[in-house]
Swiss-Prot record:
Its main location: mitochondrion. One of its GO terms (molecular function) is RNA binding. Keywords: Mitochondrion, Ribonucleoprotein, Ribosomal protein. Gene3D superfamilies: 3.30.160.20, 3.30.230.10. Component of the mitochondrial ribosome (mitoribosome), a dedicated translation machinery responsible for the synthesis of mitochondrial genome-encoded proteins, including at least some of the essential transmembrane subunits of the mitochondrial respiratory chain. The mitoribosomes are attached to the mitochondrial inner membrane and translation products are cotranslationally integrated into the membrane. One of its GO terms (biological process) is translation. This is Small ribosomal subunit protein uS5m. The lineage of its organism: Eukaryota, Fungi, Dikarya, Ascomycota, Pezizomycotina. Component of the mitochondrial small ribosomal subunit (mt-SSU). Mature N.crassa 74S mitochondrial ribosomes consist of a small (37S) and a large (54S) subunit. The 37S small subunit contains a 16S ribosomal RNA (16S mt-rRNA) and 32 different proteins. The 54S large subunit contains a 23S rRNA (23S mt-rRNA) and 42 different proteins. uS3m, uS4m and uS5m form the narrow entry site of the mRNA channel. Pfam families: Ribosomal_S5, Ribosomal_S5_C. Transmembrane segments: none annotated. InterPro entries: Ribosomal_Su5_D2-typ_SF (IPR020568), Ribosomal_uS5 (IPR000851), Ribosomal_uS5_C (IPR005324), Ribosomal_uS5_N (IPR013810), Ribsml_uS5_D2-typ_fold_subgr (IPR014721).
Length: 477
């Protein structure tokens, strides 16, 4: 209803504006500017209010009206209350603490600063971290504002301290934190004889002088011993905080414990004395540059193979799953990978790894597969012994040996495993579930659990003869 009424008014104002005579434009201009219809024509076609007011500040400001500073009399009253002048008693108290020259400077400063300016323009802090004196910090005062002194950087020729230098540094540190009275020179036997015998050796002293000196010297030693025992009982050594500070903050180099202004610690030298040749280098010269990152160093120690032999192994990723773990932080997605590794000559290994990054998971699974390689029994280096059946969860795998030239009539995952192990004639059949991961696990267990003919012969107490070799005269694989 309101929108239709507003449209009618707008249409009527346009019709009235069209009927106004065009003559005397100078005289009709003021009338048109004050006409309600013209003002209605200039408004926008919406019911929202105009936002022509000044934008409100985001910060709360204390106005002069709220402080009572609306007139000169109130400003004067506020100034006398907040910035009162020194009374005679206060000046006498200041004169008791400051000399006459300082008092003249204080009076000159009071006369130079107008308290009214502080009332109108000043900003007084009320927080607990305010300065004990009033200052706007507009300029640096060399007397009050001291420049930060930068310490000299430590020498770039500094080296690690040896045993003797470290011992001396430890003694110096102990002397720095030693508490109690400073030590003094111990008196000698010569200090207890008359002055005329100072220059003479002890053998030329008279007997009575020597006996009296020995008596006084032993009494002095006993007194010093009792004093040292009493001081040791009252004295306190370094605290746990001092020892921790020495371990963490004390420099172990010959730089006099100087601290640089840089936030970066000084770099270690190329060759540390006393440690040179003892630290482990990630790059082994025997690798011929094949493992500059040190990726296969631990694997070399566990398997006994060289990096060149490790790189010649056949590896294949058989299973790659995307798994999601529900935690209190949400769903964490990661990659689960299964990799096989073999040398193509009767060795096969299986490795599983999981990581947030797929490349890291593949790398970890590959290293585990190489580490877990085990020998696979092969008949004539081409097939397995007899028939093997293995069950893993709901997956049942049946492997059968086949004659020469039969080939690998298996699935693609078992095909890769047989090629890595060096098996060329084999047939496989899945009786139940065909889960990829369980299939690989069951096949690997089946290859490891083959019946060994030598064990069967030993168990039966009979001699084992290979019929094929006898029939063909040994002209077989």
């Amino acid at each position: 209803m309101s929108a239709a009424r507003f449209a009618a008014r707008s249409f009527l104002s346009r019709r009235l504006a069209a009927t106004v005579p065009a003559a005397a434009p100078a005289a009709s201009t003021p009338a048109a500017s004050t006409c309600p219809a013209a003002q209605q024509q200039q408004s926008q076609f919406h019911s929202s209010a105009h936002l022509e007011a000044r934008r409100r500040s985001r910060f709360k400001n204390v106005r002069a009206v709220e402080m009572g500073l609306t007139s000169d009399a109130k400003i004067e009253s506020f100034t006398k209350k907040k910035f009162a002048e020194y009374t005679e008693d206060e000046k006498a108290a200041l004169a008791h603490n400051y000399p006459a020259e300082h008092m003249e400077a204080i009076e000159a400063a009071e006369a130079a600063i107008d308290p009214k300016d502080l009332t109108i323009q000043g900003r007084l802090r009320v927080d607990p971290y305010r300065m004990p004196y009033i200052d706007d910090f507009s300029e640096i005062q060399p007397i009050i504002d001291k420049r930060a002194r930068r310490s000299a950087p430590p020498s770039h020729k500094a080296r690690f301290m040896d045993v003797d230098e470290f011992t001396q540094d430890l003694i110096n540190w102990a002397d720095e934190i030693r508490r109690g009275e400073p030590t003094h020179r111990m008196k000698k036997l010569r200090d207890f004889v008359p002055e005329e015998f100072f220059e003479k050796p002890e053998g030329q002293w008279p007997k009575d002088v020597r006996d009296e000196a020995f008596t006084k010297f032993w009494a002095y030693l006993k007194e010093q011993k009792d004093a040292d025992a009493k001081a040791a009982a009252n004295a306190t050594g370094p605290t746990d905080g001092d020892i921790l500070s020495y371990i963490l903050e004390r420099s172990s180099m010959t730089d006099n414990n100087l601290q640089a202004n840089s936030s970066l610690a000084p770099a270690l030298p190329d060759k540390v004395p006393g440690v040179e040749g003892k630290y482990r280098n990630a790059i082994d010269p025997a690798d011929d540059g094949l493992d500059d990152k040190g990726q296969y160093q631990e694997l070399k120690k566990r398997t006994g193979m060289s990096v060149r032999q490790i790189l010649q192994l056949k590896t294949k990723k058989l299973v790659h799953r995307r798994v999601v773990n529900q935690t209190r932080l949400g769903k964490i997605a990661s990659d689960s990978v299964m990799v096989i590794a073999g040398n193509g000559d009767g060795w096969l290994g299986l490795g599983m790894a999981k990581s947030v990054e797929a490349s890291i998971a593949v790398e970890k699974a590959t290293l585990l597969a190489i580490q877990n390689m085990q020998p696979i029994p092969r008949y004539e280096n081409r097939t397995i012994y007899g028939e093997v059946t293995t069950k893993v969860s709901g997956t049942i795998v049946r492997l059968n040996s086949r004659p020469p030239g039969f080939g690998l009539r298996v699935s693609h995952r078992i095909f890769e495993m047989c090629r890595a192990a060096g098996i060329r004639d084999l047939s496989a059949k899945f009786l139940r579930s065909r889960n990829p991961m369980n299939t690989v696990k069951a096949t690997y267990q089946a290859l490891l659990s083959q019946p060994n003919p030598e064990d069967l012969a030993i168990g039966r107490g009979k001699k084992l003869v290979d019929v094929r070799k006898v029939y063909y005269g040994g002209s077989v694989y």
